[in-house]
Amino acid sequence: MSQEGVELEKSVRRLREKFHGKVSSKKAGALMRKFGSDHTGVGRSIVYGVKQKDGQELSNDLDAQDPPEDMKQDRDIQAVATSLLPLTEANLRMFQRAQDDLIPAVDRQFACSSCDHVWWRRVPQRKEVSRCRKCRKRYEPVPADKMWGLAEFHCPKCRHNFRGWAQMGSPSPCYGCGFPVYPTRILPPRWDRDPDRRSTHTHSCSAADCYNRREPHVPGTSCAHPKSRKQNHLPKVLHPSNPHISSGSTVATCLSQGGLLEDLDNLILEDLKEEEEEEEEVEDEEGGPRE
């Protein structure tokens, strides 16, 4: 796929996600081709159309800007707006966020125990799902209280702030005073994080199998540091993700990596390839192409 095709696909996915998958891929693609992948302008024009067509008092609560004339008069945009009616208390926030060009998203950690593969993905808050690149199974994110990786710590005793490898819920000794401190959060890997910013402290924690164990240690605990995991012949996955049970939505969940280490263009190309393979598998099972 060309770079132009990748950009088109990204804009289609963003437009569809703004309206929670209620705009078909075919319609979104046609609009993005017609208006140069301007998902922001088309999204706002759809919201404007909804407000104009709805006619309820509730529409007064929707702050819709007047779109460009060519979009305002476009029949395809008007048709999409009509298909999204009526405006309700339940979908008002969706339309307002689309007007503001917002897609609430979060960085989440995923882990496939079968492949011993760990990755991060930026996903929509409304549908936190990602596919393992190795086995292609879809997974829910690792529970927040079980995440692991580079953690952020704030010592309540000496007020020292530091970073180090850990799993949520497992204490590590403060580099300043030695007081056991629980991690505040796990930091996702990012391109914009300085790779040369290395800690001057060697990792050390109270886990029983830590390669640089701090005493007194806690029996039955396991160190999250990659060096300890490798030295002890343990898998990379500390806590696996639960398999995702599909609800039937077909909107791809890769929106924007936002600085995460994986490249968005490659991810979209992979997703497209996998979607094509899935369609072929369904056709083989059903004995012919789908309409």
From Swiss-Prot:
For this chain, one GO molecular function annotation is: RNA binding
Keyword field contains RNA-binding: yes
Does this UniProt record's set of keywords contain Cell inner membrane? no
Which sequence ranges form a coiled-coil region, renumbered to this chain? none
Q: Where is this region: Interaction with PABPC1?
A: 102-150
Q: Which domain of life is it from?
A: Eukaryota
What protein does this entry describe? Shiftless antiviral inhibitor of ribosomal frameshifting protein
Motif residue range(s): Nuclear localization signal? 121-137
Motif (Nuclear export signal) on chain: 261-269
Composition-biased stretches, type Acidic residues, lie in: 272-291
On assembly, the entry states: Interacts with PABPC1. Found in a complex with PABPC1 and LARP1. Interacts with ELAV1, MOV10 and UPF1; the interactions increase in presence of RNA. Binds to ribosomes. Interacts with GSPT1.
